[in-house]
Amino acid sequence: MKKQRLEGIGKEIMRVISKVLLEEVKNPKIKGLVSVTEVDVTEDLKFADTYFSILPPLKSDEKKYDHEEILEALNEIKGFLRKRVAEEVDIRYTPEIRVKLDNSMENAIKITKLLNDLKV
């Protein structure tokens, strides 16, 4: 399958999952704390590697969120997410959602903090 088509399917899956996380998921471990950063669909359309970013705490004194707990909660709802993708995206076979954490936001915050510390 052409790379452009796979990217289009990935973007569509990302749109649906983002919408579901925002509007339908009620789990407090996930709601408002997680965003979808990327979806990579395999060439055979069997899997959609979905990368989730965990938003950092708003205040610096708040404790960090437990990534393992959030990852577990996401894995619990991946069947529901796949069902919603099947309902909204018009493809013959709906890929299995594979949950992966994207730590790029955390890494960017750490780098920014280090740079700010150097300026002081």
Swiss-Prot record:
<dbReference type="InterPro" id="IPR015946">
    <property type="entry name" value="KH_dom-like_a/b"/>
</dbReference>
<dbReference type="InterPro" id="IPR000238">
    <property type="entry name" value="RbfA"/>
</dbReference>
<dbReference type="GO" id="GO:0030490">
    <property type="term" value="P:maturation of SSU-rRNA"/>
</dbReference>
<comment type="function">
    <text>One of several proteins that assist in the late maturation steps of the functional core of the 30S ribosomal subunit. Associates with free 30S ribosomal subunits (but not with 30S subunits that are part of 70S ribosomes or polysomes). Required for efficient processing of 16S rRNA. May interact with the 5'-terminal helix region of 16S rRNA.</text>
</comment>
<dbReference type="Pfam" id="PF02033">
    <property type="entry name" value="RBFA"/>
</dbReference>
<comment type="similarity">
    <text>Belongs to the RbfA family.</text>
</comment>
<comment type="subunit">
    <text>Monomer. Binds 30S ribosomal subunits, but not 50S ribosomal subunits or 70S ribosomes.</text>
</comment>
<keyword id="KW-0690">Ribosome biogenesis</keyword>
<dbReference type="GO" id="GO:0042254">
    <property type="term" value="P:ribosome biogenesis"/>
</dbReference>
<dbReference type="GO" id="GO:0005829">
    <property type="term" value="C:cytosol"/>
</dbReference>
<dbReference type="InterPro" id="IPR023799">
    <property type="entry name" value="RbfA_dom_sf"/>
</dbReference>
<keyword id="KW-0963">Cytoplasm</keyword>
<dbReference type="GO" id="GO:0043024">
    <property type="term" value="F:ribosomal small subunit binding"/>
</dbReference>
<protein>
    <recommendedName>
        <fullName>Ribosome-binding factor A</fullName>
    </recommendedName>
</protein>
